[in-house]
Amino acid sequence: MDGKKLSNPFSTGNGGAAFENKIQTLFVTLMLSGGYAPCLPQGPIVRIKLQGAVDGYKTDDLIVFVEKPNENKPYKLLGQIKSSIKITKNNQVFAEVIQAAWSDFNNSDVFTKERDVIALITGPISKTDTDGVDGLLEHARHTCNCEEFITKVSRARFCSENVRNKLTAFKEQLKVVNNGKYVEKEELHKFLRHFHILGYDLAKKEGVALSLLKSRISQFNNNNPHPIWCQIEHEVRSFNQNAGTITLETLPKELVEYFKKSETSRISPDFAKENVEGDSEVGLATDWNHHPTAQKLAVANLIGSWNENNEADIKVVTQIVGDDYTNWIADLRETLQIHDRPLSYKNG
């Protein structure tokens, strides 16, 4: 009996392209909502180039441009998107990523060393790859020269065999693209300092990354954020097909307007205190940016809202914050006593 061979539904269903679209949509959502790009200095995302091969990029799935005040030249993240990958010396997908990255790294027309970064953006990868590659790249970024880097990685008690195996994988892949010659240690160290791996679970229908993104969208409007996410996806798909460049000016006006916060009147500090009904006083506005709980408040604001009586909600929050929920929430409860608190507690 003849029959077709079963294949991976993710591949036959064009899952790779769908994942790429979601990753690109993630960065556009960050741009629209005033978020920051990973691995770059904090500053507004001003444009995102999709399919940048036409402009000379080899790492071309998306190029994110970030600007900082009083600086004329933008910072760039060159991103290659792969739904899955293995970081080994023989993996063909990893070979393609390294070939493109090495070409861009040595092309001053598209990449500025000590300023721009290259990122392999992928779905969840194996624990071996995660631990090994993260350890390797962090050692590269926390050593001042190649000698210190090689010494630390080589010491058995200081570094794991897994990290050394990943170093071998990078060295062997770079040898192939360097005309069969091993890259000099100094250049290898520099390359690894500029290389990042970013993992997102956006291949899942309702993963943590998508939950955070929708929570961020909902900060601008209490309506259901899903239609807005879908609209951004649709626009990104169109730009991607045309190797376009996305800015706030090239997106539909109504989409950009959705992310504009309403104007709020500000009170001069001289009038920030006034008597209310005799002796009571309204206190000065709290500087939440420098408050001891600022980091926790930022995460809570990103999450949006959750139900403490719902175990599933608590589980998701715990996963996001990476800490015991009871410990994490304790400081936030204290902020509820402050007059201009940024949190509210219903039915409590």
Region annotations inferred by a language model:
Residues M1-A17, T29-S33, P69-G348:
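Acidic metal-coordinating catalytic centers involved in nucleic-acid phosphodiester chemistry
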Residues E20:
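Cytosolic nucleotide-binding catalytic cores of signal-transduction proteins
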Residues L62-I63:
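General structural concept
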Residues I23-L26:
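Hydrophobic alpha-helical segments that either span membranes
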Residues M31-K58, E67:
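A short acidic/basic microdomain associated with nuclease active sites
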